[in-house]
Amino acid sequence: MPFMNFRNFNFMPLLRPLNPVYKGAEHLCRKNIHNQVYNVETGKTIQILQDLVPLVLYRALPDAILDHHVELVIFPNSLNFPRIEGLTIYKFIFKTARLLLSSTYGSSAKRPIDIIHQLHSSMENKNVRYSMKCNWIASPNDEYTWVFHFDIDKKGIIYRHIIDNLERNRSRQCEKISALKPDPIE
């Protein structure tokens, strides 16, 4: 058996299947190391969202992942609600929603939200939009579906939260809620 000279052996093709992001010697440059740190911070925030969004109806998101000037956009495609900005008012809106849901649905408001679908996509300036379609069964005959979009910066901080496409499935009839209107008096 001939002696194998490892100096001339090219190991790079062996590394490609193990590392799908491999692009030649770029994996050693500082820029890519910075991107890995960026991905770790964003990944931590996404993990926190995956764990806490199902409980958001009775527990607030932690301040550590929210920007002090977080922007809340409610139904941008169907209503002209003003954009809400600031951590205090953001937390106040969700606390008010929790109180309203608990007074309307009682103990059912403590049911967790089901995350039906998740998607994250990159935006400009190394920001990430993390979207999740959520479903909440308020009662046996009342079910809600909506989409949350969280815009996350490179430090893993949420700077914008968009709530969109709210649908109510009441007694097996789905209706898109285009405005927050009360039920007709029967």
Swiss-Prot record:
Pfam families: MMU163. Keywords: Meiosis, Mitochondrion. It is found in: Mitochondrion. The keyword Mitochondrion applies. One of its GO terms (cellular component) is mitochondrion. One of its GO terms (biological process) is meiotic cell cycle. The keyword Nucleotidyltransferase does not apply. Has a role in meiosis. This is Meiotically up-regulated gene 163 protein. It comes from Schizosaccharomyces pombe (strain 972 / ATCC 24843). The lineage of its organism: Eukaryota, Fungi, Dikarya, Ascomycota, Taphrinomycotina. The gene is mug163.
